[in-house]
Curated annotation (Swiss-Prot):
Pfam families: BACK, BTB, Kelch_1, Kelch_6. InterPro entries: BACK, BTB-kelch_protein, BTB/POZ_dom, BTB_POZ_KLHL26, Kelch-typ_b-propeller, Kelch_1, SKP1/BTB/POZ_sf. This is Kelch-like protein 26. Residues 63-130 form the BTB domain. It is linked to Defects in KLHL26 may be cause of autosomal dominant inheritance of Ebstein's anomaly and left ventricular non-compaction. May play a role in endo(sarco)plasmic reticulum (ER/SR) mitochondrial signaling. May be part of the ubiquitin-proteasome system (UPS) and affect ubiquitination and degradation of target substrates in cardiomyocytes. PROSITE patterns: BTB (PS50097). The modification N-acetylalanine is found at A2. Residues 165-266 form the BACK domain. The keyword Phosphoprotein does not apply. Signal peptide: none annotated. Residues 1-21 have a biased composition (Gly residues).
Amino acid sequence: MAESGGSSGGAGGGGAFGAGPGPERPNSTADKNGALKCTFSAPSHSTSLLQGLATLRAQGQLLDVVLTINREAFPAHKVVLAACSDYFRAMFTGGMREASQDVIELKGVSARGLRHIIDFAYSAEVTLDLDCVQDVLGAAVFLQMLPVVELCEEFLKAAMSVETCLNIGQMATTFSLASLRESVDAFTFRHFLQIAEEEDFLRLPLERLVFFLQSNRLQSCAEIDLFRAAVRWLQHDPARRPRASHVLCHIRFPLMQSSELVDSVQTLDIMVEDVLCRQYLLEAFNYQVLPFRQHEMQSPRTAVRSDVPSLVTFGGTPYTDSDRSVSSKVYQLPEPGARHFRELTEMEVGCSHTCVAVLDNFVYVAGGQHLQYRSGEGAVDACYRYDPHLNRWLRLQAMQESRIQFQLNVLCGMVYATGGRNRAGSLASVERYCPRRNEWGYACSLKRRTWGHAGAASGGRLYISGGYGISVEDKKALHCYDPVADQWEFKAPMSEPRVLHAMVGAGGRIYALGGRMDHVDRCFDVLAVEYYVPETDQWTSVSPMRAGQSEAGCCLLERKIYIVGGYNWRLNNVTGIVQVYNTDTDEWERDLHFPESFAGIACAPVLLPRAGTRR
């Protein structure tokens, strides 16, 4: 660093330096007398300083302390150690007796670790391998050399593999390295079954094994394989056998195949001799034998291993006069933030304008049409339940009436089908499905016949808006159903009339989106979006849609509303657009595209098993 005072000194300052990298351009200022003052910087100075200190160390010059470990000596400069390490700074400047000693014996670190630490202090470099890294990391933590700790963490993350993962995890625990621990956990969740084949797995502490087995983050793991891994760990040490139920309670036996339970689980002594393990097995058999009572048997062992909801779509139609076909495809958007849909499975029968509702992560699929009709003559009464873990369809009791362009919602553990139309015309009837009895029964009818409406449940009540009724005002109407009183009442109407639109609840609000408005012999897209607050019985307008969508699928996924496909009346055609509305920011985000241009799509948020667990 150089400073020059006076106007003439500043002009000649740059040429006064000798060989080597030139100085950076000076920062110049002038004082009130006009004198020029320049500050120069030599970028290579810190490197030169380190090199000079390393040379002094190598030549044994100006050394003022010797650190010893097990009779191995490490000469150094106190000022260098104090500048790099909080531990040494406190030792040499904090009034400790070591400050005046020439030879200091260190305890708590290895000689190999200290050698790497001192080399780093003089070079800013450390050479690591799997053989030495634990010694170096231990020394860096003990001597409070944060840069070396961070370099060791970086190395260990890069060295992570099926073979090294658990050992690295032990280091992360020993030295309280949260970031490294998170990396180890994430790697283990992705590769658990491969890691379970390693010898290190058999030495995994009980609490760590339980941590992994109880998690929803395990990927590509069938429950039968997790069971086998847990049994292998238990059988490694006979002293572990009394803890069998503590470990195996985290295996989700009800989600196994029946053949796996019979052939691979109940045949093991441990599952018969341990009282709690016998209960887990009985729970699994009961769960599978009584599918209509599975809602009553929900427990941590019946939950799908996933904590990220997927958007799942069902059916749809291309809506052309020449093609009356409907789709049987089921697509998924794997997680919020994903950009592309992929095929998940197929429905037993193709369907469009079906309605879906989710209860305990089972998807109820009801009504719709199996051939594309412009009117209600193709309406069906069929009802199915989709189990996302076993990828299995269960045919349920049919509805009392065929329905299309109706609503299906879950309320208080029951599934409600409201309104719609069929071959006989529009409907005011409301049906209620009891999962335990597998029966549909009638509830209080709507106040008037309605089809093409939208619905959402919120706060223990069911809300129905818009649709075709008997007057124009019905297209703005809001009906509210109280299941305790079994009665409907009108609430404040929407600001915009709309039919064939969507409703979804989010954060105590109920949003009405999309749809169309009829005018004489033409139809127009409704772009306006508004939300209803039940506590105040008021509607509020928010940012409008960018493109029209009616007869579209709609659902909430982590506080964002997805509107999938449908019909665009400005283009007079079906669309494959997926518009995404952020309820937190009142903004429409970048559009997605559905694989097909379909109307009559139904969609719902569903927890799906992480990749590789569906069979």
